[in-house]
């Protein structure tokens, strides 16, 4: 999976596993739900003109490994706390996907679950250190959580309907 920005196809993406086919169309297209897997960098697009024709892109990639796997326990705990707060405010439910999650995957779990800006998620994907990803997410969620709490209070005052 890769996204496109104003400059074209970004060079860092990730492999994806299809977890669910939501809908099949008569022309063969499908609405699917996927889970990102291994990050990669595109080294060469073999058919870059295919994108303009809405066709499948093909290319050569290098799979990316993290530079380091150590994380700071305090940063990790704060990220989990902020994730729980934001998830609960957005989805009105406690996140159940934290149990048994490895520390080296926490940033990807948080970024994939919360409705963050797509280009912001791209920045997280491009970082090659779990510690860096966790620090970046903590900074973002620290700023975002108060806005979510403010929106929640406004919804509660409006009777939960969002209509005044």
What function would you assign to each model-found segment?
Residues 4-164:
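N-terminal low-complexity, acidic/polar interaction/targeting segments
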């Amino acid at each position: 999976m890769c996204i496109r920005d104003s400059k074209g196809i970004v060079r860092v993406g990730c492999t994806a596993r299809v977890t669910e086919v939501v809908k099949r169309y008569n022309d063969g297209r499908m609405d699917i739900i996927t889970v990102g897997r291994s990050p990669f960098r595109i080294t060469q697009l073999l058919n870059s003109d295919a994108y303009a024709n809405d066709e499948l892109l093909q290319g050569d990639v290098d799979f990316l490994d993290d530079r380091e796997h150590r994380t700071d326990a305090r940063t990790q705990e704060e990220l989990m706390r902020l994730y729980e707060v934001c998830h609960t405010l957005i989805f009105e439910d406690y996140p159940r996907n934290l149990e048994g999650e490895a520390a080296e995957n926490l940033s990807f779990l948080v970024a994939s679950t919360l409705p963050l800006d797509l280009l912001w998620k791209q920045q997280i994907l491009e970082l090659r250190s779990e510690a860096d990803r966790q620090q970046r997410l903590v900074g973002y969620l620290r700023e975002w959580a108060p806005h979510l709490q403010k929106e929640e209070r406004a919804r509660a005052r409006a009777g939960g309907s969002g209509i005044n």
